[in-house]
Amino acid sequence: MTKIIGRKRELQQLEEAYKAEESLFVVVYGRRRVGKTFLVREAFDDKLAFYATGVNQENKDVQLMYFYHALCKYSDAPLALPKSWLEAFDALIKILEASKEQKKVVFLDELSWMNGVDGSFLTALEWFWNSWASARTDILLVCCSSATSWIINKVFNNHGGLYGRVNRRIHLHPFTLRECEEFYENRKIAMNHYDQVMSYMVFGGVPYYLSMLESTKSLAQNIDELLFHPDGQLHREYENLYQAMFRNADNHLLIVKAMAAKNKGLTRNEILEATGLPNAGSATRVLDELEQSDFIRRYTSFGQKKRDEMYQLTDAYTLFYFHFLQDGKNNDKQFWQHHLGTPKINSWAGYAFEQVCLAHVEQIKMAMGISGMAVSTSGWFSKGKEQKAQIDLVLDRADHIVNLCEIKFSTRPYTIDKQYAETLQNRQWIFEQETKTRKSCQQVMLTTYGLAKNQYSSIIQRELTMEDLFH
């Protein structure tokens, strides 16, 4: 059995479901490439009583054909090709009734692809669970889908026979930096923390992407080989990623492109204006689907109301694509090695590092010793017309402290000069004036290598480095 990196909570949930004294219906969901199938197959290893997967963009007859071949694999008796999903699940019931396994694990992968356009698969699944499986004590039904929105809308929020039937929901997110480090160690990939952070800025914590890194090459060489070479495995990933995850993905792509042009994010109205989409529920649905799939985040500026909330693109690969690969504008197969340290890469790195930090807020709170405290997390940007100011991360603490966190990427210890010290102090003053907070404000600086000590560094009450993100 291959070692599973991280995923301790998810593995425990699956183990508890397996040991349960009643039949359970478990759904594992999350963005494409995050390791859902691998997790379930490795967790149950040789315990699977049945496994079948859907096929992307194929019709009902083709889906039934693949399901039939899966049935034949697990059946001791010859089977006829089912003419409907109801017949297919009836055949599955007979296979499970003949199984001698104490707990019969049924794993159905890429559920949304199986369902296709006519939806008859879901109706048959309802019948299978409600009329047979749920009445027993020996069935563990595990379903997966990369189409997070489909799972939520069609299964979790089902208004028919599946309403309230899912017993466990496991949302699989990308790896944290600590889990990535464990992954590299397991793969014998030598990489210091700076390169691991840089890798996260490019690939996120997506296991499938990380599995392509070759231990014999440097990170820069791997980036060039995977992303900039015309035949690189991830050179055309953007073209496939959204189409595979979302049915009718054109509006998703419109919104993502609009967000990529505005680092701090956009309000819903700004998104509609930038994309030309109608002010209707369909736009809200697309935004929800992108958020539920870990491509964007929604946040409210400190002190602002929900109607002022912002949507921000956070998916590392997508951000990288729009900076360097969009429209095939880059023909240099060794672009990364040729441009390391240049303004083009440095300007991207500042924002990409900020997103890495925002993905590790729990680790930041732990490093600051406030993980057990009630803390509200937000960003902040000034509404003033004359003096513009923005704060990357605001931690509003129950002990009447507000941490104003500045995030800076640097290849060496970061130096605060007189001008920047004045900027930080002025920004705090504007924050206090506009928000009218009665709490004490403290400046926090999170950098790659810490601060260079000088006469101005003392204005920072708390200093964090990239090492604190690896907790």
What are the residue ranges of the model-derived segments?
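A cross-kingdom feature that marks ATP-driven nucleic-acid transaction machinery
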Residues: 302, 309-471
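Phosphate-binding site recognition
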Residues: 1-339, 343, 443
